[in-house]
């Protein structure tokens, strides 16, 4: 199954935070799609 992205940390660069949230959104989309 999909691997949940790990939070890069509060002191991570903005690019890493943006990438994390994008990955998290895709992860949640995949998880919810498989659930129903």
From Swiss-Prot:
Alphabetical UniProt keywords: Amidation, Hormone, Secreted
Chief location: secreted
GO molecular function, one term: neuropeptide Y receptor binding
Family, per entry: Belongs to the NPY family.
Function: Hormone secreted by pancreatic cells that acts as a regulator of pancreatic and gastrointestinal functions.
Gene Ontology cellular component list: extracellular space
Keyword Ribosomal protein annotated: no
Single GO biological process annotation from the record: neuropeptide signaling pathway
UniProt organism field: Larus argentatus
Residues bearing PTM Tyrosine amide: 36
Record-given protein name: Pancreatic polypeptide
Pfam families for the chain: Hormone_3
Keyword Ribosomal protein attributed: no
Locations listed in the record: Secreted
Name of the gene encoding the protein in the UniProt record: PPY
InterPro entries: Pancreatic_hormone-like (IPR001955), Pancreatic_hormone-like_CS (IPR020392)
Domain of life: Eukaryota
């Amino acid at each position: 199954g999909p691997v949940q992205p790990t939070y890069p940390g509060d002191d991570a660069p903005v690019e890493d935070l943006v990438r994390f949230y994008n990955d998290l959104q895709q992860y949640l989309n995949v998880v919810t799609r498989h659930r129903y």
